[in-house]
Amino acid sequence: MKRKDFLSTLLPLGAVLAASASTKNVVIESSKIPPYLKKGDTIGISSPAGYITLQEIEPAILKLKEWGFNIKIGTTIGKRDFTFGGTDAERLADFQQMLDDEKVSCILCARGGYGFIRIIDSLNFKKFTKKPKWIIGFSDITVLHSHLNANFGIASIHSKMCNSFPDDWAKADDVQKESIESIKKCLVGEKMKYTITPNAKNKTGIAYGELVGGNLKTIESLSGSKSDIDTTGKILFVEDTGEYLYSLDRMFWNLKRSGKLNKLSALLIGGFKIKKDDVGEEFGKSIEEIVLEKVAAYNYPVCFDFAVGHQKNNFALKCGVQHKLSVHLNECMLIEVK
């Protein structure tokens, strides 16, 4: 996983965002859902992983204010300790303050990179669990999504971060704008619906379950730790960037061997920016072949080319929230059901 949030479209994803229709006669249990935001609420911006400057997050600040939210800038913005947004102690203190501040209704991570795993075990979630708030991010922030789900059953939002907001909104691609706008839709409580162009390699079917997942390499790195997620009965989504095909094959084998694939409700495969094989060391399998080999014995639906990852079409997903996935030959759809 690279530190940079790549903005190039990696796979032909063709996702469309809209408010979903209600789904009836579905008995489900949900994670704890933080309160949705309203105009005038405060969003705190912190950088618990890689470093970023105030100038780099200004486009995000402008858009969030345009949506009607107030902004609190964390002390890590503008700080740098090598690749990190400040020392471990500084990043820990900033994020802890955001967690505990009752005036902050939501925490938006400024960027990913690497570093959350260095502070996750030192964070105190006591106040947060009593009064949860939405936490937003992806890539390295998968550490937090997984930790919240595994330990507290609290929902969070997997989406673009501050470093992905376009400098000039008027010149941004429509899909980039839609991806950013999906964050607002999640925050204000819209039920999300995504329609995905089918991939011929998909495994068809209909599934219900809690949505969990994130960056594949990060998920793999959490195996056996207190942040490791239980995927039983859940819809798992994964994405990654900057990896060789053989490395991805190893990661998916690890998921299979550790029991994360055998009891899924469904599997979503997002964008994968793949390193070119070294000459003479070609792996010989596509990402679809790698995945299908590992899930051949299972009957749940598998959807490729989902609009999540290090790319322009990286739509906001509510982790820990119940969804319905329908994978058909002519259409694939993910709908939030509660």
Protein language model regions, located:
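Short, acidic/small-residue loops that bind anionic groups at enzyme active sites
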Residues: F125-H147, A155-M161
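N-terminal small/polar loop signature for handling phosphorylated ligands or for N-terminal nucleophile
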Residues: T75-K131
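Short beta-strand elements in bilobed, periplasmic/extracellular small-molecule ligand-binding domains
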Residues: N70-D81, I235-F237
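C-terminal active-site/capping subdomain that shapes the small-molecule cofactor and substrate pocket
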Residues: W253-K338
